[in-house]
């Protein structure tokens, strides 16, 4: 039997993670998670302001909490430089990069099963170019 560390077993609402699918969705299935992962996969290292400008309609509070969550989940790294003014950059970890094929599959599925107009992200465009 596979067990996950205690930090994954319960969230703020006391919902148990019962299977690998739930774990995966909990890790990268948040509203902004995949958008930030897509952005970092395209541009590799970005500062907070650059992420804020490129992710439409995200508030500072939502961006800050999403970045913290992605760091805690091991999907992104935070690089802080000893400069004035302070310089901080974010980049995908190997674990974060491992999510990209999953997101590509979701893009492909969505494109095949949606009859509306969708604006593809960088990862979706890469998948579309392969076809």
Region spans (language model):
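N-terminal intrinsically disordered/low-complexity leader segments
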Residues: 1-16
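Residue-level recognition of specific faces of alpha-helices
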Residues: 24, 36-39, 66, 98, ...
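Non-catalytic interaction surface on structured domains
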Residues: 23, 27, 52-54, 78, ...
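Amphipathic alpha-helical dimerization/coiled-coil segments
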Residues: 2-6, 97-131
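Canonical helix-turn-helix DNA-binding module
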Residues: 49-81, 85
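N-terminal helix-turn-helix DNA-binding core of bacterial DNA-binding proteins
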Residues: 15, 19-62, 89
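Basic, amphipathic "hinge/linker" alpha-helix immediately C-terminal to the N-terminal HTH DNA-binding motif
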Residues: 82-103
């Amino acid at each position: 039997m596979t067990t996950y560390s205690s930090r994954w077993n319960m969230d703020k609402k006391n919902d148990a993670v019962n299977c690998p699918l739930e774990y995966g969705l909990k890790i990268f299935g948040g509203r902004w998670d995949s958008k930030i992962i897509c952005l970092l996969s395209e541009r590799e290292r970005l500062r907070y302001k650059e992420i804020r400008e490129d992710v439409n309609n995200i508030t500072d509070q939502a961006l800050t909490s999403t970045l913290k969550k992605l760091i805690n989940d091991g999907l992104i790294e935070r690089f802080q430089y000893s400069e004035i003014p302070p310089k901080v950059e974010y980049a995908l970890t190997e674990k974060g990069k491992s999510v990209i094929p999953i997101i590509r599959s979701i893009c492909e599925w969505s494109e095949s099963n949606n009859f509306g107009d969708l604006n593809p992200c960088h990862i979706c465009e890469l998948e579309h170019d392969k076809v």
